[in-house]
Regions:
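Feature recognizes metal-dependent phosphohydrolase scaffolds
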Residues: 1-221
Length: 221
């Protein structure tokens, strides 16, 4: 439903429910057909696959209530918002969790939200602003939807890949769940790219570093 509300997210390829063939137990994704256990989709309305059934609405409302009324979760999330940020510049270093979206040529990827174009630092500033509005501001569906985009959007600085949760959960063929990474992960070890990113955030020291979360750590190496 979020994807349908926001064509600017450019995530129509993640609309998969209408591609399930309930008769022969398969799903076709990007031209490839895979077997799938259709018994797991007994409540799916093939005429309106992206509408929740009354029972599903009840489950979602119960989950929403539990999350919204968890005092411990409120405390933890409040701490993250009060102390954290999408990125931080500290001691001539740049700290961020995911990536700085790049295009295939290693330039900052330009993305459009709210009829404005963002790239590099301006994209992360925009993400931080909307995340805070979603938490502190009056209820706004667009802001809440953007929080979902930050989790799984192709050009989200917190994600950096074409996330395939559906394929991992329901398709046994592992080739279906290979996630295409943002070009950032191809370039990020190159000095000129690191320097370009640091300059974008007004960091010019010869001892500046990018401290990048969301990257695997090899144990015992």
């Amino acid at each position: 439903q979020i994807i349908k509300r926001h064509p600017e997210y450019k995530m129509d390829d993640r609309l998969l429910l209408h591609k399930i063939n309930m008769e022969d137990g398969t799903i076709t994704i990007e031209g490839a057909t895979y077997p799938i256990d259709t018994s797991l989709f007994g409540s799916l309305d093939k005429d309106n696959p992206y509408e929740l059934s009354p029972g599903e609405v009840h489950v979602m409302n119960s989950l929403k209530y539990s999350f919204a009324n968890s005092s411990r979760l409120k405390k933890h999330v409040g701490f993250l918002y009060s102390k954290g940020a999408i990125y931080i510049c500290c001691n001539n270093n740049l700290l961020f969790h995911g990536c700085i979206p790049l295009d295939k040529d290693g330039n900052f990827e330009v993305v459009e939200f709210d009829d404005n174009l963002y790239k590099g630092k301006s994209l992360l500033d925009y993400a931080d602003k909307i995340a805070r509005r979603a938490y502190y501001g009056e209820p706004n569906q667009n802001n809440l939807d953007f929080m979902w985009y930050l989790w799984g959007g192709k050009k989200s600085p917190l994600c950096g890949r074409n996330i395939k949760t559906f394929e991992r959960a329901f398709i046994d063929d592992e080739t279906a769940s290979v996630e295409e990474k943002d070009p950032y992960y191809h370039y990020y070890l190159e000095e000129k790219i690191a320097t370009m990113i640091l300059r974008e955030f007004k960091l010019y020291s010869d001892i500046s570093h990018i401290i990048n979360g969301h990257t695997p750590t090899l144990i015992g190496v």
